[in-house]
Regions:
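Aromatic-lined carbohydrate-binding/catalytic grooves of carbohydrate-active enzymes
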Residues: 66-117, 221-222, 287-292, 302
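Active-site clefts of carbohydrate-active enzymes
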Residues: 31-35, 253-255, 259-261, 305-336
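Catalytic domains of carbohydrate-active enzymes, especially glycoside hydrolases
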Residues: 52-79, 83, 205-210, 282-286, ...
Length: 542
């Protein structure tokens, strides 16, 4: 009898282990929540803030792959009344600014004033508490050098510090002319101490699991030519000390996450020696990320992974909201298939986690008049950021297996942030000369067997290039189609791509006459049984 019981127990254990093995492995997903979005979206949707509604923001993410919520508590204005910076309440009551009469009482920020002064609702305390109840780690996020509206004489985003201390701006040797010239100069001790003092006060007030130091709002922290990695590393040591002191008081770890430019060289040229921060254990999570113009589908995640080797720092590449392949064209919102494609590529390149920026909720999403994410070029319900769509892909993005197996698109984009003396690389328009191959590279990650692959080229005039190869494998021309959404107005030439096992697609284009290309993407679709193969490929598996 004892032997039978032991065998039965062992059999049950094996079944449990088999079930665990079959369950897709989940990775952490960090989601940054903007400091103004709650007020802007609730005001637009006509939502009245109550404690339950405030907590409901966090409850929406239960059952998704979001493991960490990073609540922005300051850009240039603080989210709550404090002893260091002006708050939204201060701006609401302001009547004079920069020698001019102002009134911000009809602005959507009045929602925050009502919550704090009339209802007694501390949204950050409620969000932190509800996050823990929901099994989500709560963080406080700090934008270190935001510069929205700095060329306007008055703004609800201007602190008095900005007006009173022009000597603290990064460009003082000439008249300010560029968007970032009025950013603050971190070589000035008063600038650094002001930020550290605010972080210290917020960590004393709130029991957060971590702090995000967001250097991408903005990276322009020094006068041109005076970028100092030593100054920034010393600053990060101070942040680490504040986090460790908070951890000692709270009895749990308080981690440090930093958001930096997409590639290590650009980060260093701006003064951010992220590799040194990792070596010194000053940070726990590193987020290389584009600035804003477009998602970067060619993040050097594999290079960052090598730099962080043996440091224990978690690598979480960042996804932006928008996508574009021409710096001078209006961008589009990412599509769900493009989000899957980006995630699959990042996991294949070595990402430990993923980070989402500008992906917010939308309480008015059911009504076209109140929805926050409106676009005249993309119908409601077709964008990845549309709330109903978010709630679907947020349940799969934490699984490398799920995003790799699903329908996904990989579009060639560009890097939107480069050192001051460099120029943004523009992939299009791209000229293909007769008889001279033109090369492109798409990071795709491994593609499972049983998939159809469609390479799509935007070609001016619509004449298909005579030869196209992917990873030295010849591709078959299938026909032309319209680009929807209109990433390009040129006809799209579609090619069937043979299966490949590499992590990236190196595309080689040859033409028997000069050609101009305006778009490139690769669509990965599951094979639909019972459909003519050529028709299936031309329709993209839809």
């Amino acid at each position: 009898m004892a032997v039978r019981r032991t065998s039965l127990f062992a059999g049950c254990c094996l079944l449990v282990l088999a079930g665990l093995a079959a369950e897709p492995q989940r990775r952490p997903v960090f989601l940054n929540y903007d400091d103004t979005h709650y007020a802007a979206s609730r005001s637009k949707a006509g939502v009245v803030p109550t404690e339950d509604e405030v907590r409901g923001l966090v409850r929406q993410y239960r059952g998704t792959d979001v493991t960490d919520l990073l609540f922005c508590i300051c850009g240039r204005i603080a989210g709550v009344t404090n002893g260091v910076k002006e708050s939204w309440c201060d701006k609401y009551h302001q009547t004079a600014e920069n020698g001019r009469q102002v009134s911000y009482t009809n602005h959507y920020l009045c929602v925050y004033r009502e919550m704090e002064e009339e209802l007694g609702l501390d949204r950050y305390a409620l969000w932190i508490d509800e996050a823990r109840r929901s099994g989500i780690r709560p963080w406080l996020s700090f934008r270190m050098n935001d510069c929205h509206c700095t060329y306007e004489p008055t703004s609800f985003l201007h602190p008095d510090f900005f007006h009173r201390h022009p000597e603290c701006r990064r460009v003082r040797h000439r008249a300010a002319s560029g968007y970032f010239d009025n950013c603050l100069d971190y070589s000035i001790a008063a600038v650094r101490e002001r930020e550290l003092k605010f972080i210290r006060e917020m960590l004393a007030r709130y029991d957060a699991d971590g702090v995000e130091i967001d250097w991408l709002r903005e990276v322009y922290c020094f006068a041109p030519g005076r970028e100092s990695a030593a100054v920034m590393t010393a600053f990060m040591r101070s942040v680490r000390e504040l986090a460790d002191a908070a951890a000692k008081r709270r009895g749990h770890a308080v981690r440090v996450l930093v958001r930096v430019p997409a590639d290590p060289e650009t980060a260093l040229r701006f003064g951010f020696d992220a590799a040194a921060w990792a070596d010194e254990k000053l940070v726990d999570v590193l987020v290389p990320c584009p600035r804003w113009e477009t998602t970067d589908n060619d993040l050097p995640t594999d290079l960052w992974k090598r730099l962080l080797r043996k440091t224990g720092v978690q690598l979480a590449p960042g996804l932006e909201l928008r996508i574009c392949d021409h710096p001078w064209k209006a961008p589009f919102y990412m599509l769900t298939n493009q989000i899957r494609g980006w995630a699959a590529a990042q996991y294949s390149l070595g990402a430990d986690a993923l980070y989402l920026y500008n992906y917010f909720d939308d309480p008015g999403w059911k009504n076209p008049k109140t929805t926050y994410w409106r676009s005249f070029d993309q119908p409601q319900g077709t964008k990845g950021v549309d709330w109903a769509n978010q709630l679907k892909w947020l349940k799969e993005i934490g699984s490398p297996e799920q995003v790799a197996a699903g329908q996904r698109d990989h579009m060639l984009t560009y890097r939107d942030l480069v050192p001051l003396w460099d120029e943004v690389r523009r992939p299009f328009p791209a000229r293909v000369e007769k008889g001279a191959p033109k090369f492109f590279r798409l990071a795709t990650g491994r593609i499972p067997a049983g998939r159809t692959l469609r390479l799509r080229l935007g070609v001016k005039g619509g004449r298909p290039p005579s030869q196209v190869f992917v990873n030295s494998r010849p591709c078959r021309y299938l026909g032309n189609e319209e680009c929807v959404p209109a990433f390009t107005s040129d006809p799209i030439c579609v090619y069937e791509v043979p299966p490949y096992t590499e992590d990236a697609a190196v595309v080689e284009v040859l033409a028997d006459a000069p050609a101009e290309l305006s778009h490139l993407d690769l669509q990965v679709r599951q094979i639909c049984r019972g459909t003519d193969p050529a028709k299936r490929l031309l329709l993209g598996g839809r």
